[in-house]
Design a protein with these regions (language model features):
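Shared catalytic-loop signature of beta/alpha-barrel
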Residues: 22, 26, 184, 195-326
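Metal- or metallocofactor-binding catalytic centers and their adjacent structured scaffolds
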Residues: 2-68
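Glycine- and other small-residue-rich loops at beta-strand/loop junctions that grip anionic moieties
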Residues: 6, 53, 137, 162-165, ...
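Glycine-rich, aromatic-flanked loop segments that form ligand/cofactor-binding clefts
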Residues: 56-97
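Extended hydrophobic packing segments that form well-structured cores
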Residues: 323-344
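Conserved, mostly hydrophobic/aromatic
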Residues: 56, 69, 121, 161, ...
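Metal-dependent enolase-superfamily TIM-barrel catalytic cores that perform enediolate-based chemistry
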Residues: 83-84, 88-205
Length: 344
């Protein structure tokens, strides 16, 4: 029996493999603290390892779910929703790549996403950081958001992600929000590198203007503790976004409770990982304050995905043990086995 998961965004080194050696021969049911058939925390023996490499939650929850006959979400708690909303996070800079087509290139991609069933889309912004001259980039960001809203109507959530594209440019970030006010931007993500002072100012400006746009951030923070200054004494980040693989199940569950207590929510970041989407779905199924997942529409040819189905903007999870995935052994042997690494 196997547990399947995904690493982070860098190759696994020999040093990392060496650190994982204590897992060899360990009873999977003793790697975590089990209470009433659920995972209640990390066992003391493996606590440091599992906090350092939180992405191990993926394969370990998959394995433990298969051993116990439970879906991964059921190892976290009761189901809190039957279907899990997902937004399309793949809309990038098509107007830049295909400059002869301009803004309509992005609009067409959004319309395609809506036809697929997505009721929320996230647009890449921040063109003035490096893709275009500063003022031209700001104008294009505004034009893209407003054109998309005109094309899709009021029923689709539009999120904006400058990827820190307004670094050292608070005024530019505010001009962006003013310029798209008519388009009802659902959230602004990573307008600039997170800072208590910066988000205190931005939060105040949004409130004074009577806007409803939320502040989202945190994909580069690896544990719940760094989020605390943004939750207390006043909530400065409305949507916390610790990466689903970087934080794994347990740290993301902990963070969701912190966010919920402050009146916010957690919608974990995910990029370039079909397993990451699936992990997010299992977390959302059991965590009340994780109301939505980021779908990057990734696929992996070596995976057989049996446990989830997308329809009309939401996913349903089948009652399959673990994450509901398996490896296509024929494809693995023909394409990937020669490059495998192992802990020994």
């Amino acid at each position: 029996m196997e547990g399947i998961g995904a690493g982070l965004y860098a190759p696994v080194t020999a040093a990392v493999l060496e650190e994982m050696r204590p897992l060899l021969g360990a009873d999977p049911l003793e790697v975590y603290r089990m209470e009433g058939g659920r995972i209640a925390g990390r066992s003391p023996r493996f606590d440091a390892l599992l906090r350092k490499y939180c992405y191990l939650d993926g394969p370990l929850f998959d394995l433990i779910g298969k051993l116990t006959g439970k879906p991964a979400w059921a190892l976290l708690g009761n189901a809190v929703r039957e279907r899990i909303p997902a937004y399309d996070g793949t809309l990038y800079l098509s107007d830049v790549w295909f400059h002869d087509r301009g803004v309509p290139a992005v609009v067409e991609e959004v319309q395609e996403a809506v036809r697929k069933g997505y009721t929320g889309v996230k647009l890449k912004l921040g063109r003035g950081l490096k893709w275009m001259p500063k003022e031209d980039g700001l104008a294009r960001d505004i034009a893209v958001v407003n054109a998309v809203r005109t094309a899709v109507g009021a029923g689709i959530r539009i999120m904006g992600d400058p990827n820190n594209g307004y670094k050292n440019d608070f005024d530019g970030a505010w001009k962006l929000l003013q310029g798209v006010r008519q388009s009802n931007l659902y959230w602004i993500e990573e307008a600039f590198p997170e800072s208590v002072d910066g988000y205190t100012r931005l939060k105040a400006k949004i409130a004074e203007a009577g806007m409803q746009t939320l502040i989202a951030d945190g994909e580069n923070l690896g544990e719940p503790a760094p989020f605390l200054p943004y939750m207390k004494p006043k909530r400065l980040i409305d949507v916390v976004q610790m990466d689903i693989r970087r934080g794994g199940f347990l740290s993301n569950l902990e963070l969701s409770k912190i966010a919920g207590a402050a009146g916010g929510v957690s919608i974990p970041h995910n990029w370039a990982s079909q397993i990451g989407v699936i992990m997010g779905l299992h977390l959302s199924k059991a965590a009340i304050d994780v109301p939505m997942v980021e779908d990057d529409r990734s696929t992996c040819d070596v995976l057989n995905v049996e446990g989830c189905r997308f329809e009309k903007g939401t996913y349903a999870l089948a009652d399959i043990p673990g994450l509901g995935i398996s490896v296509d052994e024929k494809i693995y042997r023909s394409k990937y086995a020669a490059a495998e690494v192992a802990v020994s």
